[in-house]
């Protein structure tokens, strides 16, 4: 990037994210009118894509001489990523075989992930920290992709704005058939996350409601958290 600037002292703030090739200046996943208040696009809200990855840079009091200068900057990621994986595909297949009129093929299921409480929605490039949150955010995954030999299936995933410390969000994961009937619901699923790390949460998302004797689950979540550095 090349800038024409007069001699003096400057503050440099940068934000980079993905844009559509046919309209590169339009905001796609983040509103970037102000770098002190970068906010996620919530209408519509989009998840299940790595195109939400982004990076920023902030440095104050940069002295620029009359002859100019060349700077190399190291961008930082203000995000953490997580994914939800159902580990009970084989148990669900058994339910399909026993009651095919109730339990449709995996490709006919819809998964909805609802963030419980507030979800980080804003980021201040000048401080390197989230600065806003909203409630009522959710996303859906329609038609699960898997092979007949798979024992696990990816239900969904998202990126979360973070600072330099660990934090968490709680979600409700609801699985429905193509008629909207609820087959399983797991609430209070805690997702721990950390900047530039991937958190993978495994659980009985497809059959947990059956094994617990009902559809709704509102107990302590016993999932497994794997973090890759």
What are these regions (language model features)?
Residues 85-97:
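Structural motif
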Residues 19, 89, 201:
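Residue-level marker of positions within ordered structural domains that often coincide
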Residues 1-81:
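Short, low-hydrophobicity acidic/polar segments
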Residues 1-27, 94-194, 223-229:
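Tryptophan-paired
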């Amino acid at each position: 990037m090349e800038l024409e600037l007069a001699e003096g002292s400057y503050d440099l703030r940068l934000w980079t994210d993905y844009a559509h090739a046919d309209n590169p200046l339009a905001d796609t996943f983040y509103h970037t009118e102000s770098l002190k208040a970068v906010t996620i696009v919530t209408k519509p809200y989009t998840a299940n894509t790595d195109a939400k990855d982004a990076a920023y840079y902030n440095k104050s009091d940069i002295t620029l001489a009359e002859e100019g200068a060349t700077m190399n900057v190291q961008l930082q990621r203000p995000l953490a990523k997580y994914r939800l994986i159902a580990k009970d595909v084989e148990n669900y297949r058994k339910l399909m075989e026993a009651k095919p009129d109730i339990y449709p093929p995996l490709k006919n299921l819809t998964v909805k992930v609802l963030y419980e409480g507030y979800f980080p929605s804003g980021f201040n490039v000048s401080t390197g920290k989230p600065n806003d949150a909203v409630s009522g955010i959710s996303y859906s995954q329609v038609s699960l992709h898997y092979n007949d030999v798979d024992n696990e299936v990816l239900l969904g995933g998202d990126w979360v704005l973070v600072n330099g410390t660990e934090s968490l969000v709680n979600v409700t994961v609801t699985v429905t058939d193509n008629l909207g009937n609820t087959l399983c619901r797991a609430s209070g699923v805690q997702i721990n996350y950390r900047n530039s790390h991937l958190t993978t949460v495994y659980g009985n998302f497809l059959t947990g409601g059956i094994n617990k004797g009902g559809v709704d689950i509102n107990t302590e979540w016993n999932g497994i958290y794997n973090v890759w550095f």
